[in-house]
Structures are given as C-alpha cells and as structure tokens.
C-alpha cells in the first residue's frame, strides 16, 4: 500500500519543534507509515540533527514529488528564512514568528494543491507570531483562513477520547456571548459528521457546561 505524503512544518525555529521533527523522522514508527516532507530552514534543521544526535541525511527538494522514501533521509523544502546572526534559542522574536507562519502557510499550500495528503504541525510560539504581526493567534485560525474554512473544528484525542472545543482563544466575556443554543446544536451536528469521516459511526457525546 502506498504511504501517505505528510507535510510537516518545523514550528518555531527557536523552540523544540525542529528537534521533534529530527527525532520523528529518525524513528522506525514514522518511517513505516508515511513519507514526510519537512518545511523549514536548512540551517535550523541541521542544528536540530546535531543537537539530537540523529543519523539523518538531508534531501533538499523543491516539490513533494521529489521526496524519497528512504530510512534516515529527511526530505526538506528549505525556505531559508532565518538569519543565524540574530537567531537565539528560547527567545521570542518576530523573525521566528514570521518564519513559523511561513512554514505552516507553505505546508497548507501544498495540501490545498493536492501535493501532500495531510499536514502535521509542531509547536509554535503565539508571542512570536504576535511580534511578527501575523494576524492569526494560532494553528487553528491559520488553517481556517488559508483553507477558506469558516469556524473550523479543533479536536484533541487521547486514549480513545475525542474532545472538541466550542470556543477557543477568546476572553471569558466573549466565550459567554458565543455559547448559544443554536450554536451548540450546529456544533454537535458538525462534530458528528467529522467523527463519521474518521470512521466513528456510533458513540456517546457528552457536552460540558460552564
């Protein structure tokens, strides 16, 4: 069976995302299930490989169809958008926020064009996004805007339990204004359809109150 092609933006260059990527690509578990296309900055990825000590070879590509399915090979689309002279690990910066956004945007562009089957994200820093004047607060809002999806769903899954969020990234006052009967009914219907797409045909849905 042909493996799906997954785009993975490296997240905030100053954070742990690039190291997570290096460790994931080096793992047998990830290699067995997908062909991964990393979107990031080569200099940052090389540092992540050095820090983690993983035995990885970078295969720099321009398009996902150039990716190779070989153990120990990290397929990379290099956006070359980090200035190492001003870069610092663990620091909030507009440069890193802008870079992180560009990695996500490029990954979504590939998905929208049908060049990859899905996008798997890594950690970003909301303060850095703000410093870069990115007009979105996080992943969900970026995906919603760049896929032209109004009111996108967010779902977490842990130990077989799936959690959807009626509100996110808003103040308590805004949250209270958003919790309306019609919105809840609409959300339950949308969540049910989303679960069906994931293969969940039957189950029990609990709705948490305030």
Give the ranges of each region predicted by the language model:
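Short, flexible loop segments at boundaries between secondary-structure elements
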Residues: 145-161
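Active-site glycine-rich loop that binds ribose-phosphate moieties when present
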Residues: 141-150, 170-196
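Contiguous, glycine/small-aliphatic-enriched amphipathic segments in soluble metabolic enzymes
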Residues: 1-139, 182-210
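Active-site-proximal beta-alpha loop/turn segments in soluble metabolic enzymes
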Residues: 124, 167-176, 208-210
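Mobile beta-alpha loop/short-helix "lid" or hinge segments that flank ligand
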Residues: 156-164, 168, 205
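Short connector loops/turns at beta-strand edges and beta->alpha or beta->beta junctions
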Residues: 81-84, 160-161, 169-171
């Amino acid at each position: 069976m042909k493996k799906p092609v997954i785009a993975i933006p490296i997240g905030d260059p100053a954070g742990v995302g690039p190291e997570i990527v290096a460790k994931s690509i080096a793992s047998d578990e990830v290699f067995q299930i997908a062909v991964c296309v990393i979107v990031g900055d080569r200099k940052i990825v090389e540092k992540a490989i050095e820090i983690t000590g993983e035995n990885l070879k970078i295969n720099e590509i321009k398009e996902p169809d150039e990716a190779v399915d070989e153990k120990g090979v990290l397929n990379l689309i290099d956006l070359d958008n980090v200035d190492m002279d001003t870069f610092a690990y663990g620091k909030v910066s507009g440069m890193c926020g802008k870079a992180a956004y560009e990695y996500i945007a490029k990954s979504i562009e590939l998905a929208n064009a049908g060049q990859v089957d899905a996008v798997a994200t890594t950690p970003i820093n909301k303060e850095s996004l703000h410093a870069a004047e990115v007009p979105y607060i996080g992943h969900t809002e970026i995906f919603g805007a760049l896929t032209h999806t109004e009111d996108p769903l967010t779902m977490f899954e842990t130990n077989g339990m799936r959690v959807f969020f009626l509100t996110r990234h808003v103040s308590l006052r805004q949250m209270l204004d958003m919790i309306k009967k019609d919105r809840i009914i609409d959300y339950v219907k949308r969540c049910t359809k989303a679960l069906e797409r994931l293969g969940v045909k039957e189950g029990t849905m609990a709705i948490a109150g305030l």
